[in-house]
């Protein structure tokens, strides 16, 4: 049966199921305008009907309800309490209060698991700790891959800045749900999602006709559908959630605000898998006696992201504190089908702007996702970085424990540093950190020819005792062709010397331009490169103040022109390379670092000069 036929079958089946559920929930037999509107409310699970449930959940997640006595004061039974606390956002929302709560919840940030201390447990198991943010190794919140680029610097977009919050916020309570692991089950979920969104759009249209809704936005992106889409993507995990996280780093001005809202929330949330599935993954990778590798293992994850979750543990062999990344079952095998189904939804909805080259973005995402799902590949890159920085006085890379790792499980050394932005530093320390990060970024491009391309700054810890920067998450590491790197470095040098003709020539050789673009497009492209190279320019100040930089804002001004006028997508390398570069600039800006960029740049790239 053709894929389109499967979509039709699943869509029809889901429509019958959802409409029937809505019809049975009607409280009166007569059909009124309000009931027609209610019939379009499709939910993935039962909703709480009590204001007390909403009140309890909000208080619980804010840390105000901790004991049974407090719960009883709210007048709820233990059954009600369990249902309320374990329910997801849709379960307890009222049209207004639920949206408000979800928005508050999506903005929360939690500590990096690799920087959390491990506490021994009398029962030979690590005591459950408050959930903390996934180390950047799986923060795929963390992983922040833009799916598309406007042109040379289309990754410099405002939403990246929003992911680098420096506030210490309350921990998020992870919801647990089974990961749909087979292709058929995932296809069924996508079909149900498509139907729910369609019925929701019809319902929204009827509400507007009857004057019930004052919303004037896109029908498909009504408030109800936003909740459905966020809930489904966080439940599905895998490529669906990953793609949402990638798209979340596109400029919010170029995408419908409600799409941006959806993407921001799926970037910051995911469900953890039940313990039964955790056991299955561990057995598959390390054997039935997998627990013999650990003297302690916390079965409750510290955090969950798009392709896996993180657990704290201690090795049995040497009692070292470690973190264990466990991949969701079926994520690797479902990448192709997930992205195909997601592309179907994106094309059908027409919610993405012209110029994003969806097919190219999906192709890049497909390749990178498969790399990131290969934990053995990640282990190899971690060891490679570790070897290069083994004797470095400024950087540390976690050890990989191969005996406790597999294709979808990786055990890494626990690091004691704190994620950048989690604490305040003196100006001198911020300058030092900015200098080291700039040096490492340029070193990866010009010397290593491979980079860790995840821009999330939770991947960079600072250890106040050792004064070292600790590097995490090598799943997004990519090696670049030497010919590409040579021309790319020459392009950066030309931009630093403000040579427009040479920039244009090298841009054509690299594939950013094809000599048929309009003068307006060429100017926008070259101006964006000049802006990118500003900290390294020959006429730049010796010490560049990132705290005052406006690079991001000025490059953003060129993006609409490039999206509208470009004739071809940028080189494939751009998607990952500029993700790292843009992330580095924003990281230094958040630190407010003052760095001798020009000196570093000229010294490290001088052998690429003509």
Curated annotation (Swiss-Prot):
Pathway: Cofactor biosynthesis; ubiquinone biosynthesis. GO terms for cellular component: extrinsic component of mitochondrial inner membrane; mitochondrion. GO terms for biological process: ubiquinone biosynthetic process. It comes from the Eukaryota. Pfam families: ABC1 (PF03109). GO terms for molecular function: kinase activity. Residues 98-111 have a biased composition (Basic and acidic residues). Residues 98-144 are annotated as: Disordered. It is found in: Mitochondrion. Its EC number is 2.7.-.-. InterPro entries: ABC1_dom, ADCK3_dom, Atypical_kinase_ADCK, Kinase-like_dom_sf. Keywords: ATP-binding, Chaperone, Kinase, Mitochondrion, Nucleotide-binding, Transferase, Transit peptide. Belongs to the protein kinase superfamily. ADCK protein kinase family. Atypical kinase involved in the biosynthesis of coenzyme Q, also named ubiquinone, an essential lipid-soluble electron transporter for aerobic cellular respiration. Its substrate specificity is still unclear: may act as a protein kinase that mediates phosphorylation of coq3. According to other reports, acts as a small molecule kinase, possibly a lipid kinase that phosphorylates a prenyl lipid in the ubiquinone biosynthesis pathway, as suggested by its ability to bind coenzyme Q lipid intermediates. This is Atypical kinase COQ8, mitochondrial. It comes from Schizosaccharomyces pombe (strain 972 / ATCC 24843) (Fission yeast). The lineage of its organism: Eukaryota, Fungi, Dikarya, Ascomycota, Taphrinomycotina. The gene is coq8.
